[in-house]
Amino acid sequence: MQSYQEEYIANVKEIAALTAHKSPGGRSFEEYLEELLANRREAEQKTNRNMELLREGLQPTLEHLFEADAQELASLREFASGLLAGTNEVDGGLFCQVHQALLSLARLNRDRNQMIQELYWLGIGRNNLCNKMVGLETTEAEKYTHKMRLCFTEAAAYLKYYDEIEDTQTRGYILRSRANISLGHFRSPGEKIRLTRQTLEILQDRSYQEKEPGLPWERFIYMTHQQMASSISRSKTEVMAPEDIASLMDSVYIVYERRIRESAKQSQKPPFRSAFSYASINYYCGLDTLDGLLSKMELLMDETDIHDFSPDNMYGLISIPAFYCQYLQEYPERLPQKKEYVESLYQKILDYLRLFPDASGNESLFFYLRQLSCTFVETGDGISYGEFLQKLLILFAPDIYVHSYMVGKASCAFCRIILFEEPSYFDDIDHIRAVEDPRQKQAAVLDYAMQCGLFHDVGNLNFISLYTQISRQWFAEEYEMSKLHTVAGNMSLSQRPSTRLYAEAAHGHHSWYDGSRGYPGSYRRLECPQRQMVDIIGITDFLDSITSMGQLHFGEKKTYAEAVREAILLEGRRFSPLLTARLREKEVAEALRKAFEEGRREAYYHLYEQEASS
């Protein structure tokens, strides 16, 4: 690996550490704040340095890739392997860019073996992106799933030329690609099961095995059985066909029996994942009742340890509860008797997350948390969904929490100014119009503004690595993917009573006032009763975002005065003229600036309190 590549990876890891939540360690708030701000200044410097490294080191290499010698190409591949290794993500987007460039080179050189290898690795990188789509509708995620699957499908198509290809490694990539076609989300579980079944037939074909005895066939077959075992559809609306259940049963039992043997040798219990799959398939085959399955899941979850950060314990402590709550969502009549247990589950998970060491880049952890967030069940007495989301932001994305808090405070200041001039400005919003007393109405508006600010960016939790680890300007594909945070936020907030009121703020804060641009297309301003508040969240989000470190993902940071001028220039197009007219007044712009500053300090104090009490 070249020196600039090593420095880039080291900087990404250091930036993640600098911006992660910190323990006060007995220091005063002022000392704590001073360190946080110093860390963010250092992180900004390292981000600028990384962009310089890519500009001066990687970009010239990629532009002259056809002239690169074998050593340079090997260095690039080693660099890529350091960007994404298994579930440890340093920079998945750059991983894809490097392998896309290497694939283009292989195509031009007509190097079939190298082309198959690059298709495989590009597919792995794209699958990493697809894993961030948990909870989104299939229509939203399909574009990314399709790109991922195309890579594996093209590589797997060379199975037709298996006899011609003599390289053992290349044959292995073809077979692994064939298995990976079944990765990602499908519209029905039957599609995934059918593809996996076909892969098993190929891997178990003696003719292929005899032609390449050097490949680890047993391992390939076992891993494909694992993939099949993970295809269980835990939904009462998606009924699996009998032949699919039969295939699942075979794979689940094969995996479970092997795990039992391996665990027995080490005097351990079977892994949580295998035990859960075994219990699930027994339920789907009619060998157990739903109550029986829930009881077995409870036994597994009770065995987890909040001090064990192994992949299997993490699965048992976060992912199994996600499926447990999914059953309770689909069968709500079971919730009353499980209420106290669910509340204790969420508390145990939060205790575990507070203790979790060095979570940055742990894609498995964030994948399981996305699952848990999608199936979260509010009991009425335990932690609300809104509180749970705020705790996740504080623990894993403190900068997003600080930004959201600042947007909330500035929105309150803007609302206060508007209410002084037009007390009925927000009366299109049902719960605001219902309040008659002027003081109570103002309090309701300000509380609503604050909560909308706090929750407007929760969809970023789906794409957390983009915000907490990417230390460079985003690639076009990453920017497009980040737009889905509005859809993800709207979906998650709208499905729970405690957050339903704030869903439109998450949905529409990047839309344009005149509808000419912005996103998502599903937000239609004139059809939204909360549009006045969404307008305010949109403009305050803009004013803070382009003046913060996060702006480095798009270009250069602006000063606050420049941000105000830019917002005014977008009057009537991106922003409501009713808001920009007030922003022209120096007193209003200054009041918002002070609110941002106060909000930043208050948000950091909340971080300080949370860490001091944990």
Describe the residue ranges of each PLM region.
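An active-site-proximal "capping" alpha-helix that borders the catalytic cofactor pocket
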Residues: 405-416, 481-494, 559-576
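Histidine-centered active-site/metal-ligand motif
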Residues: 403, 456, 485, 509-510
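Short, charged, surface-exposed loops that flank catalytic or proteolytic processing sites
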Residues: 473-474, 551-562
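Acidic/His-rich, divalent-metal-binding segments that scaffold phosphate/diphosphate chemistry
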Residues: 344, 348-480, 523
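Non-catalytic interface/linker regions that flank or bridge core catalytic/transmembrane domains
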Residues: 2-406, 410, 613-614
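A short, hydrophobic secondary-structure junction motif
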Residues: 99-103, 127, 151-162, 256, ...
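Histidine/acidic-rich helix-loop-helix segments that form or flank divalent-metal centers
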Residues: 166-169, 214, 429-453, 493-539, ...
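Short regulatory "switch" loops immediately downstream of catalytic or recognition motifs
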Residues: 125-135, 203-208, 228-234, 409-430, ...
